[in-house]
Amino acid sequence: MRFGKVPGVLKGYQMKIAKICMTVTALALLAACGGGGDTDSSTKPIQTSTTEGFWTGTASTGNTVQLVVLENGETWGIYSRAGVLRGALYGNTTSASGTLSGSGLEFGSTGLASGSYSGTYTAKSTITVKTSDGGTFNGSYSSAYEQPASLSTLAGTYVGYVATKTASGSDSVTISNTGAIQAGSASTCLSTGTATPRASGKNVFDVSIKFAGSTCLLGNGTTVTGIAYYDTASRQVMTLALNSAKSDGLLFLGKK
């Protein structure tokens, strides 16, 4: 796992996606809160600062890394160079008292790369990560993570590009103001699912999408789960979701 070590990630998809690659944010790493003891009502819980949030920065490979670390430690993200998408990342991180560690997967057209990482951070400020194969990442926190996720803001039809580990293409996705997701058609591949604001109250949606049809890239009947982030300034959505085995998944970037 080296934030871009796998060559040719999402090959054939890169030039198309350059037009819409958005400045979402993201790697970072876990989130956890400590609780207070049985004291009187005037005593506030003690909170432990972690790496939860959106982070963006540059890796030693020269790629721009954009990742999100959820409150449960899951990390999701993309990396790009000069506006060209290079790949996707998924991992799990733990952090406390300014140090972090974790492991994850890097998805590319040639397969999967796995690895571990460790580093240091200042909560809601900066982060430094070193991977097991020598790669490094230095990132900064984005306060956009603090904005509540809104289904009414997310709703609309997005035109963009979708990719799996081995294939890519253009597509349009419609999301209703209740969070219903639909793309494709029953005659080829119909994708249906839901987007739900995370209970954390942050600017992240939980997504679940099921594919039905003989031409579906991930196979008929496959369900993927993951997250989505909507950037209000660019009117673009990023969705990253994996199958149950975490052996493949999809990346969608679209604009409405």
Identify the function of each model-found stretch:
Residues P45-V65, T126-G169, L251-G254:
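Tryptophan-anchored aromatic micro-motifs
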Residues S97-F137:
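Extended, hydrophobic interaction surfaces within ordered domains
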Residues R2, V6, K11-G12, K16-G53, ...:
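Bacterial Sec-dependent N-terminal signal peptides
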Residues C33, D38-L70, E74-R81, L85, ...:
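Long, low-complexity, polar and repeat-rich extracellular regions
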Residues I127-G134, Q236-D248:
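Short, exposed beta-strand-loop hairpins at the edges of beta-sheets
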Residues G102-A113, V204-G226:
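An anionic, turn-rich surface loop/hairpin at beta-sheet edges
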Residues F54-T99, T164-G213:
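N-terminal glycine/threonine-rich, aromatic-flanked beta-hairpin/loop signature
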Residues L67, G91-T93, S118-Y121, T192-S200, ...:
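Extended lipid/amphipathic-ligand handling interfaces
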